[in-house]
């Protein structure tokens, strides 16, 4: 949520800031602005709406000159999306200019204190409180002021500040919100995420909580809140700039759907050797795995759907009790965690605020934490006992596709590792299953050929007001994901239900022509789900059945049939999700929606 960029160097700051903000659009935003310093004065241009609106406004005012600046895309939390509430904000008499991601929890009491001191507020934001507070503490020493601000506020933040009497300098800090420093030659950069600086440098500092960075064009110095200099290793980005570009595709989501075979292959292949699973990142011994009392899985959004699938898979293959929680619920219900329990946290960004808080809750109760993360060196990755990276590469579209599939791949690997440790996976069976796993990329390549068929299906149902998804077991977990994909990018109301729950109220919503996706790929549950298909069909539903090649009998009761290859039942989620992603994509395209940046959503939810 929100995005920060900064630049200090010898080149014009404005185009660099704008380019950086465009690379952060995936994070979600409703307004944007930049501030550029020149000749002891910092000028601000900001507006509600998209970055193109900001560019138009910059053109109207003749642009901003200067070689030092900061920029921001805002996702509204305190105050409506307006020009006034957009960042950057001024502090004091205008000598301080500040941008901020996060939430300041004690902003009301600080605002009252500052108002009593004569500070005048023009916006509804908590960020303006930070700007005035920085001015309040600023006596000519940027580091002193930042430390005092950090000791005064409560909440989460990444912040960047310009002071008019310190030309050529940016000071920044973070707590529970990501921030990186890009290292150049005669120039340095600041950003919420790597794509914003990748055009200019591959070398970065990844700031940790309670760290401060002071940037000039020739130097970057890091400090802690005791003002000690912090020495940090340089992180070198290995993936290509093209990985964060569309490369001829109409949308990032379309490109990332097509990249799923590679994401799964790259996640699996280093961890399968000669038909055996090897996860060197996982330090749990066989004895520790045998003594696991319960696996607690915590995640948000689509990652939670991966966790739902993981529960079924772990319990089936390893017979270890498993509980899957929404991270936002887990942390507040005082979960019961006993000795020997482990917690698996799943997050694409590694910065999801609720998931990070849940991780800390689990660790405080003595659980060993294993994370499944896509972004290297992210906060969740750093704070976990073990981290297993998905090799999906940068995922730009807000709606996850390839990261979701790579997360499932890690779940399969963990299930095999756990099953082997507890003595439930003979060597020959392990070889059979790993062979099936390594077939997934090619099977998905074949499913991508269903594009025309699914586009035709989208044309048929694009006018629908409601779409329902049903399934049992693992098919229910993927029904949840299919429903979420559809509603988050096409804005069509959609719900997923466990098929066995239809008679407990949901079936009353089925009317003549209501589209119902029935995911029915699990052999042992097929007949039961077929019964549910008959129930909704009898009430006028248009049934789209998603089945394997083995389930020919469904054709008699379904209006449309989508077939996926047969594989081990526990691996079917990776195949089932592909047609649902493609269908959702074309529904959104046909409805004229912003596929990559759905309204009100953010890629990385870094506030609670």
Identify the role of each PLM range:
Residues 1-251, 262-294, 305, 332, ...:
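Conserved short alpha-helical segments that host acidic/polar catalytic motifs at enzyme active sites
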């Amino acid at each position: 949520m929100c995005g920060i960029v900064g630049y200090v160097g010898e080149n014009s700051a404005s185009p660099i800031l704008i380019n950086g903000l465009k690379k952060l659009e995936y994070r979600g935003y409703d307004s944007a602005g930049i501030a550029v310093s020149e000749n002891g004065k910092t000028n601000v241009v900001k507006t509600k709406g998209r970055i193109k609106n900001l560019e138009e406004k910059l053109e109207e005012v003749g642009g901003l000159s200067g070689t030092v600046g900061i920029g921001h895309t805002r996702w509204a939390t305190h105050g409506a999306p307006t020009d006034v509430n957009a960042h950057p904000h001024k502090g004091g008499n205008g000598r301080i200019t500040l941008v901020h991601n996060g939430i300041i929890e004690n902003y009301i009491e600080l605002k009252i204190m500052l108002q009593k001191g004569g500070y005048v507020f023009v916006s509804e934001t908590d960020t303006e409180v930070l700007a005035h507070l920085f001015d309040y503490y600023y006596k000519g020493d940027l580091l002193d002021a930042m430390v005092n601000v950090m000791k005064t506020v409560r909440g989460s933040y990444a912040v960047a500040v310009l002071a008019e009497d310190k030309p050529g300098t940016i000071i920044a800090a973070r707590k529970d919100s990501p921030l990186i420093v890009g290292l150049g030659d005669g120039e340095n950069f600041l950003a919420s995420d790597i794509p914003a600086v990748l055009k200019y440098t591959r070398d970065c500092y990844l700031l940790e909580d309670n760290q401060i960075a002071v940037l000039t064009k020739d130097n970057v110095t890091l400090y802690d809140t005791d003002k000690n200099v912090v020495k940090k290793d340089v992180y070198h980005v290995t993936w290509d700039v093209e990985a964060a570009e569309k490369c001829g595709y109409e949308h990032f989501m379309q490109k990332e759907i097509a990249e799923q075979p590679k994401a799964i292959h790259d996640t699996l292949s280093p961890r399968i050797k000669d038909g055996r699973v090897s996860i060197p990142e996982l330090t749990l011994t066989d004895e520790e795995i045998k003594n696991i009392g319960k696996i607690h899985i915590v995640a948000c959004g689509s990652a939670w759907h991966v966790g739902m699938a993981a529960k079924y898979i772990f319990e089936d293959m390893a017979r270890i009790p498993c509980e899957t929680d929404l991270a936002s619920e887990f942390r507040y219900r005082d979960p019961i965690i006993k000795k020997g329990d482990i917690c698996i946290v799943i997050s694409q960004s590694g910065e999801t605020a609720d998931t990070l808080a849940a991780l800390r809750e689990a660790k405080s109760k003595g659980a060993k934490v294993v994370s499944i993360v896509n972004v290297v060196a992210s906060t969740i990755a750093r704070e976990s006992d073990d981290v297993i990276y998905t090799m999906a590469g940068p995922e730009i579209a807000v709606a996850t596709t390839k990261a979701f599939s790579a997360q499932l791949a890690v779940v399969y690997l963990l299930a095999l590792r756990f099953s082997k440790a507890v003595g439930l996976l003979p060597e020959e069976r392990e070889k059979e299953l790993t062979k099936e796993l390594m077939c997934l990329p090619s099977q998905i390549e074949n499913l991508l050929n269903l594009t025309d068929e699914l586009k035709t299906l989208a044309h048929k149902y694009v006018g629908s007001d409601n779409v329902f998804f049903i399934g049992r077991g693992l098919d229910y977990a993927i029904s949840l994901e299919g429903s979420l994909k559809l509603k988050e990018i096409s804005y069509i109301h959609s719900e997923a239900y466990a098929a066995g729950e239809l008679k407990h109220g949901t079936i009353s919503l089925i009317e003549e022509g209501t589209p119902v996706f029935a995911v029915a790929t699990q052999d042992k549950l097929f007949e039961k789900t077929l019964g549910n298909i008959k129930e909704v069909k009898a009430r006028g539903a248009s049934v789209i059945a998603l089945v394997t090649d083995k389930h020919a009998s469904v054709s008699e009761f379904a209006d449309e049939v989508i077939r996926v290859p047969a594989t081990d039942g526990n691996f079917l989620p990776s195949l089932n999700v592909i047609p649902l992603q493609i269908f959702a994509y074309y529904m959104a395209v046909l409805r004229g929606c912003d596929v990559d940046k759905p309204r009100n959503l953010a890629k990385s939810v870094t506030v609670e």
